[in-house]
From Swiss-Prot:
Protein name: Membrane protein insertase YidC
Quaternary context: Interacts with the Sec translocase complex via SecD. Specifically interacts with transmembrane segments of nascent integral membrane proteins during membrane integration.
Taxonomic lineage: Bacteria, Pseudomonadati, Pseudomonadota, Gammaproteobacteria, Vibrionales
UniProt keyword annotations, A-Z: Cell inner membrane, Cell membrane, Chaperone, Membrane, Protein transport, Transmembrane, Transmembrane helix, Transport
Highest taxon of the lineage: Bacteria
Function field: Required for the insertion and/or proper folding and/or complex formation of integral membrane proteins into the membrane. Involved in integration of membrane proteins that insert both dependently and independently of the Sec translocase complex, as well as at least some lipoproteins. Aids folding of multispanning membrane proteins.
InterPro entries linked to this entry: Membr_insert_YidC (IPR019998), Membr_insert_YidC_N (IPR028053), YidC/ALB3/OXA1/COX18 (IPR001708), YidC/Oxa/ALB_C (IPR028055), YidC_ALB_C (IPR047196), YidC_periplasmic_sf (IPR038221)
Family according to the record: Belongs to the OXA1/ALB3/YidC family. Type 1 subfamily.
Region (Disordered): 36-63
Gene Ontology CC annotation, any one: plasma membrane
Subcellular location: Cell inner membrane
Transmembrane portions of the chain: 6-26, 342-362, 417-437, 455-475, 496-516
GO molecular function annotation: membrane insertase activity
Gene: yidC
Membrane topology reported for the UniProt record: Multi-pass membrane protein
Length: 540
């Protein structure tokens, strides 16, 4: 067995797997969850799609929008319906070195991504897209002042003796805002309403590149399904309708690094739904009806998250909301790695330096496996003369050859898989760390030093990938091999070139990790080889 060749093949398979997995995330989201059985709740919310116009008309023209500015958000709210039609993330720039903020929500001719909410039911005021309430406001703009921790933006509407107060509540430093309806019924009759809240976005392709495709689409959580993607293709195939028996869950539209989500206020019987209107897709929640007696009042409320995928903050807003940071099937490894990376960054103050420190920690922890790998390779190499003599003596009798080889391995106390098994055991860590780096919004537009101004983007001058390829070439040259077949030798020589090509388009933060990992490998390899030589295990 040529362990060096197998290690390189495993490494190539690892990169190919990562690329394929990225492509799968973007192009083929996981199959939809099986809907839960209907709750035994006596007042489940109806499917929202059943309450609207069969053929919705054009959204009625806005009378005006108001602007709300906090320390982290700048929102535009339409006074017709009270929807959030624009959202700037003040602490995140649209492009590197740009003064323009990143726009998450917007309503333009070419693209729509908005957060809508309203009241439906028998006396609903938001049943028709062409006849929504015109709210009155006290000002055209509202600002969270210095020293102020909370900002309330009330909007009022009165019809048929019923007063509606829709209030947006903002907290300092928070991307979560509350939407509250206070309804006062002075109509002389009972009135029944239920609140809905959904996100609407153009149906579109996932986008991204071959090495960094990104998922853009719906996602949700219920009491039975912690996290599930529901793509635009899924929405077009079938409308989702799930009854939340205990009212816990959320509905979101997600994309790389950012997300918007509606979280109901734990009202049993809430309906989680999707629907498609032309080229627009909705995902949201419809809460159960409440009947308000004349002379009485009631409150309806939900929480809207609109911002970056910040795990700790999202976890505090809603259970499982932090899972929109999708680490894949190795999340239980990737999440602690990300936490460790963030912990290191809090001390060193630079994400690139934190990646270097994390690499040394990970490779240090895996040193026993690395040592076992090289020791096994050295033992196998010393057996090569005996194995060659065995082949010449036995000839084409494969069964006998296999039997005598195993006896030789047992006698010499050598594991034939020892050179590959440690690397295979390390693969989950490599894959998990890959996803931890790919999914971290903290790395977006984060500089390292010199020419690396954005660890989430590819190296503009390809210096890191070239250094990574050179380090891989050095590892290959320093590693002894028994390969004599010319074709296999060419393949092994070409592999650093192939890896370099792949990494030209990878985020520089990931390439930095791989480069430092290779440097650590060179150091460990040198030290281990010297120790093995002292023990009489020849490495060449």
């Amino acid at each position: 067995m040529d362990s060096q060749r197998n290690i390189l093949l495993i490494a190539l398979a690892l990169v190919s797997f990562l690329l394929f997995q990225q492509w799968q995330v973007a192009k083929n989201p996981a199959p939809q969850a099986v809907e839960q059985a209907q709750s035994s709740s006596t007042l489940p919310a109806p499917s929202f799609a059943d309450e609207l116009d069969p053929v919705p008309g054009q959204q009625q023209a806005s009378a005006k929008t108001i602007t709300v500015t906090t320390d982290v958000l700048t929102l535009s709210i339409d006074t017709v319906g009270g929807d959030v039609v624009h959202a700037d993330l003040n602490k995140y720039s649209a492009e590197l070195d740009s003064s323009d903020p990143f726009v998450l929500l917007k309503d333009t001719k070419g693209h729509q991504f908005i957060a809508q909410s309203g009241l439906v039911g028998p006396q609903g005021i938001d049943l028709s897209s062409t006849n929504r309430p015109h709210y009155k406001v006290s000002a055209d703009s509202f600002t969270l002042a210095d020293g102020q921790d909370e900002l309330r933006v009330p909007m009022t509407f009165t019809a048929n003796g019923i007063e509606y107060i829709k209030t947006y509540v903002f907290k300092r430093g928070s991307y979560a805002l509350n939407v509250e309806y206070d309804v006062v019924n002075n109509s002389g009759n009972n009135a029944t309403f239920g609140m809905y809240a959904h996100l609407r976005q153009n149906l579109m392709d996932a986008g991204g590149s071959i090495t960094m495709p990104t998922y853009r689409g719906g996602a949700y959580s219920t009491e039975d399904v912690r996290y599930k993607k529901y793509s635009f293709e899924d929405m077009q195939d079938r409308n989702l309708s799930i009854n939340l028996a205990d009212g816990q869950g959320w509905a979101a539209m997600i994309q790389h690094y950012f997300a918007a989500a509606w979280i109901p206020r734990n009202e049993p019987g809430t309906n989680l739904y999707t629907r498609v209107i032309g080229n627009l897709g909705d995902i949201g929640v419809r809460m159960p009806n409440k009947t308000i007696a004349t002379g009485d009042q009631a409150k309806f409320e939900a929480t809207l998250w609109v911002g970056p995928k910040l795990q700790n903050e999202m976890a505090a807003v809603a259970e499982n909301l932090d899972l929109v940071v999708d680490y894949g099937w190795l999340w239980f490894i990737a999440k602690p790695l990300h936490s460790l990376l963030a912990f290191i960054q809090s001390f060193v103050g630079n994400w690139g330096v934190a990646i270097i420190c994390l690499t040394f920690i990970v490779r240090g922890a895996m040193y026993p496996l690395t040592k076992a790998q090289y020791t096994s390779m050295a033992k196998m190499r010393m057996l090569q003369p005996k194995l060659q003599a065995m082949r010449e003596r036995i000839g084409d009798d494969r069964q006998r050859m296999s039997q005598e080889m195993m006896e030789l391995y047992k006698k010499e106390k050598v594991n034939p898989l020892g050179g590959c098994l440690p690397l295979i055991l390390q693969m989950p860590i490599f894959i998990a760390l890959y996803w931890a780096l790919m999914e971290s919004v903290e790395l977006r537009h984060s500089p390292f030093f010199g020419w690396i101004h954005d660890l989430s983007a590819q190296d503009p001058y390809y210096i890191l990938p070239l250094l990574m390829g050179a380090s891989m070439f050095l590892i290959q040259k320093m590693s002894p091999t028994t390969v004599t077949d010319p074709m296999q030798q060419k393949i092994m020589t070409f592999m650093p070139v192939m890896f370099t090509f792949f990494f030209l388009f990878f985020p520089s933060g990931l390439v930095l990790y791989w480069l430092v990992s290779n440097i650590v490998t060179l150091i460990q390899q040198t030290l281990i080889y010297k120790a093995l030589e002292k023990k009489g295990l020849h490495t060449k």
